[in-house]
Amino acid sequence: MDKAAEQSLRAGQIIRRLRDFVARGETERRIESLKKLLEEASALALVGAKDRGVRVTYAFDPTLDQVLADKVQVQQVVLNLVRNAIEAMEQSLRRDLMIGTERGEDGMAVVKISDTGRGIAPELAGQLFQPFVTTKSHGLGVGLSISRTIIESHGGRILVEPNPSGGTIFRFTLRAVSPEELQDAH
């Protein structure tokens, strides 16, 4: 029991430090290719997924590619969401994972990661981004809390909703860079 309490305290300290770090604005935000960022992060997260019967599809909006982001931080969010999706589909007969982008409101890019896993109980969905809340039998329940901190530090939002075809959809937003801004940057 003492060990579990100790681990919880340690995880809480890690989350607090990350929030402080992000709150101080210590991020390396640059203009990045969203498609490339997503492909690189998902390639790492998808190692072994094919062997588990996961079918992956990509659906990128061709008119939307450049975002203002700290590449490493956002890739950590993608890595976390994709790994969670793969784990959620372990018991599913259909294991479809979709990673895509679409244009959102107010100059935001929307990243969408959907799975056909077991889904999330409605009573848990509202708490999912709180530290130590998890749907897994293992793990600390800090990944989504950290992901929310990262996305909010980028001026975005992260949301969860049921997938109409079964499973879960996570969406997060990042500021898209307009062609005019891109021109001015060069």
How would you label these PLM feature ranges?
Residues 24-27, 66-69, 135:
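Conserved micro-motifs of the catalytic ATP-binding
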Residues 143, 147:
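Short alpha-helical Gxxx[C/S/T] motif in the catalytic ATP-binding
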Residues 95-98, 102-111:
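Short beta-strand-loop-beta element adjacent to the nucleotide/active-site pocket used for signaling
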Residues 150-152:
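Detector for a conserved hydrophobic position within an alpha-helical segment of the HATPase_c
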